[in-house]
């Protein structure tokens, strides 16, 4: 197996301008639509990664505090979930011994989450927005000959890319090769 490499950035003309051919997928043939999306994800992965990074950076630039705080709240909430799951008996004892302190802690966390909701929305949109645009582009973009050749090289294992590995992990390697 060869080493994993990020493919080159595709020209803007190939990606969205001039020679880019766009067409709505046929909703009656979901398998073909899936093949188109997977093959475009493989071929334009560097362009998509750049678009995702720009979207995340833009959201971080526009509302940096909310983006950072929402990431912190998500991390803390997950940490609390893991902690409570591992130490359920201790949480139960604490709740019985100090009900007022537990109630105050729950209210404080709730208040923090409510205060950060704007940031959480910013964080979600900074991820969901670029991902949605990527999937729309991958659905609408028709494949060209160069795209098909690159995807065949990837499918027979001569060239490994991060998106190819991700698709394999998701069980889509047979889809990508067709």
From Swiss-Prot:
How the protein assembles, per its UniProt entry?
Interacts with CCR5 and GDE1.
Q: Which InterPro entries match?
A: Prenylated_rab_accept_PRA1 (IPR004895)
Extracellular compartment spans: 63-64, 120-122
**Of which family is this protein a member?**
Belongs to the PRA1 family.
- Domain of life of the source: Eukaryota
Q: Which UniProt keywords apply?
A: Endosome, Membrane, Protein transport, Transmembrane, Transmembrane helix, Transport
- Organism (species): Macaca fascicularis (Crab-eating macaque)
What biological function has been recorded for the protein in this entry?
Answer: May be involved in ER/Golgi transport and vesicular traffic. Plays a proapoptotic role in cerulenin-induced neuroblastoma apoptosis.
For this UniProt entry, what's an example GO CC term? endosome membrane
Q: Which residues lie on this side of the membrane: Cytoplasmic?
A: 1-41, 86-96, 141-178
Q: What is this protein called?
A: PRA1 family protein 2
What compartments host this protein? Endosome membrane
Q: Biological process GO terms, please?
A: protein transport
